[in-house]
From Swiss-Prot:
Motif (DELLA motif): 34-38
Region Disordered, residue ranges: 1-28
Identification of the protein by name: DELLA protein RGL3
Organism: Arabidopsis thaliana (Mouse-ear cress)
GO cellular component, one term: nucleus
GO biological process: gibberellic acid mediated signaling pathway; response to gibberellin
Coiled-coil segments on the chain, per record: none
Spans annotated as Leucine repeat I (LRI): 155-209
Entry keyword set: Developmental protein, Gibberellin signaling pathway, Nucleus, Phosphoprotein, Repressor, Transcription, Transcription regulation, Ubl conjugation
Length: 523
């Protein structure tokens, strides 16, 4: 099943949100309208701001005073969409006599933003999770009473986010400053996954506007490990990545007596116990297993400790095991002679899970790294990457793509696997740090440069690699793993021209592929 990825687009003749702001939001008769409220759909003259604020304050007092004792709905006057805030507030103050009972936690469901959604669309209220006004419960199918319809907070939130990002791209920082404050207020009132992801995007925009960037030296590697462990436990994305890569490795070494794996990102080594146990059960006895783990120099002691723990496991399950830890600041600094490969006597595998996209931050580095991989002549290369295009030149395009992508990720955390709230929060922080890097930084500091499977296919092909079909068995077993891990109905495994993808609802989020040297290079 091959997915057709379709980007959200805006007709060329349609003015941008920032242009609407700068032109008074569209038109004659709206002169002197407050531009920051206008982008959110409210028509308020600058001269009326004080009067509107007073009316809204009075309305809030009336609602607060009446909520404890009222049980009826509004009278028979219809209150229309409150785009005219002044008239709406006055009408409410005049006609509001009673206040319906309300469960303050009442919310409706919010779909994740998908590629087919127009971010500014106002269609279909049924699937948006928004915290509704106190009058919400007065709406029934048979009721003839008047109701008040509040504009969807979620739609306004996305509009404000995109408008702010566009203002940033146009370097209109005064407008961006005002909009990012509005985004923060809207995000605070938005329930569920959308409110959470918007809060991280608002912080990232604010950091970009005010040029407040976290120092790379200030990031504690041990804290990063904790976040990644929680992400691994909380959702199936890393489990899927490790499982599909391991399955490809097992199929490539069925008759090998010596297996050597070079892991370009050892991290906590969570991938390798499962592979070692599978090798131990291989018919005819396990092969000798060599693991070369690459990590950051700041974690040199942790790498050696991990090697010791894996050696203990290997001894317990009867697998001959050797470990070699390598440290480097940049993967592009690796050289072929560092790996001590033995081409004649071993099957060599190079493994990369979410490690290639950061290399794109340095021009020419990915080409050098892939040339090094090619030089060691691996029998197999496994690659798992995020299925997203976050490495384009245009900031607004990257922002829109990231908003869609992380909305789906946050939604899967909210509605997918049932997990403790603390683990979910840590996973959200893990993803939030990616959002901050993607939106707030530029140049070599921006390492979250995710690319799609189609883009990686071009890069791997240019570097001299041919694709390896992961096969129907890997598809079936990955689907089974997903079911056994309690992944929820929203997750699904998709096959894409021999590669596998893990999707939430209809949006692929993770892509796993396997590669071998082109035929002319395998001699």
């Amino acid at each position: 099943m091959k997915r057709s990825h379709q980007e959200t687009s805006v007709e060329e003749e349609a003015p941008s949100m920032v242009e609407k702001l700068e032109n008074g939001c569209g038109g004659g008769g709206d002169d002197n309208m407050d531009e920051f409220l206008a982008v959110l759909g409210y028509k308020v003259r600058s001269s009326d701001m004080a009067d509107v604020a007073q009316k809204l304050e009075q309305l809030e007092m009336v609602l607060s005073n009446d909520i404890a004792s009222s049980s009826n709905a509004f009278n028979d006057t219809v209150h229309y969409n409150p785009s005219d805030l002044s008239g709406w507030a006055q009408s409410m103050l005049s006609d509001l006599n009673y206040y319906p009972d309300l469960d303050p936690n009442r919310i409706c469901d919010l779909r994740p933003i998908t590629d087919d959604d127009e971010c500014c669309s106002s269609n279909s209220n049924s699937n948006k999770r928004i915290r509704l006004g106190p009058w919400c419960d007065s709406v029934t199918s048979e009721s003839t009473r008047s109701v008040v319809l509040i504009e969807e907070t979620g739609v306004r939130l996305v509009q404000a986010l995109v408008a702010c990002a566009e203002a940033v791209q146009l370097e209109n920082l005064s407008l961006a400053d005002a909009l990012v404050k509005r985004v923060g207020l809207l995000a605070a009132s938005q329930a569920g996954a959308m409110g959470k992801v918007a809060t991280y995007f608002a912080e990232a925009l604010a950091r970009r506007i005010y040029r407040i960037h976290p120092s790379a030296a200030a990031i504690d590697p041990s804290f990063e490990e904790i976040l990644q462990m929680n992400f691994y436990d909380s959702c199936p994305y890393l489990k899927f990545a490790h499982f599909t890569a391991n399955q490809a490795i097992l199929e490539a070494v069925t008759t090998s007596r010596v297996v050597h794996v070079i892991d370009l990102g050892l991290n906590q080594g969570m991938q390798w116990p499962a592979l070692m146990q599978a090798l131990a059960l291989r018919p005819g006895g396990p092969p000798s297993f060599r693991l070369t783990g690459v990590g950051n120099p700041s974690n040199r002691e942790g790498i050696q400790e991990l090697g010791w723990k894996l050696a203990q496991l290997a001894q317990a399950i009867g697998v001959e095991f050797k470990f070699n830890g390598l440290t480097t600041e940049r993967l592009s600094d690796l050289e072929p002679d560092m790996f001590e490969t033995r081409t004649e006597s071993e099957t060599l595998v190079v493994n990369s899970v979410f490690e290639l996209h950061p290399v794109l931050s340095q021009p020419g580095s990915i080409e050098k790294l892939l040339a090094t991989v090619k030089a060691v002549k691996p029998g197999l290369v496994t690659v798992v990457e995020q299925e997203a295009n976050h490495n384009g030149d245009v900031f607004l395009d990257r922002f829109n793509e990231a908003l869609h992508y992380y909305s789906s990720l946050f939604d899967s955390l909210e509605d997918g696997v049932v997990i403790p709230s603390q683990d979910r929060v840590m996973s959200e922080v893990y993803l939030g740090r990616q959002i901050l890097n993607l939106v707030a930084t530029e140049g070599s500091d921006r390492i979250e440069r995710h690319e799609t499977l189609a883009q990686w296919r071009k890069r791997m092909g240019s570097a001299g690699f041919d694709p390896v079909n992961l096969g129907s068995d890997a598809f079936k077993q990955a689907s089974l793993l997903l079911a056994l891990s309690g992944g929820g109905d929203g997750y699904r495994v998709e096959e894409n021209d021999g590669s596998l993808m893990l999707a939430w609802q209809t949006k692929p989020l993770i892509a796993a592929s396997a590669w071998k040297l082109a035929a002319e290079l395998r001699r």
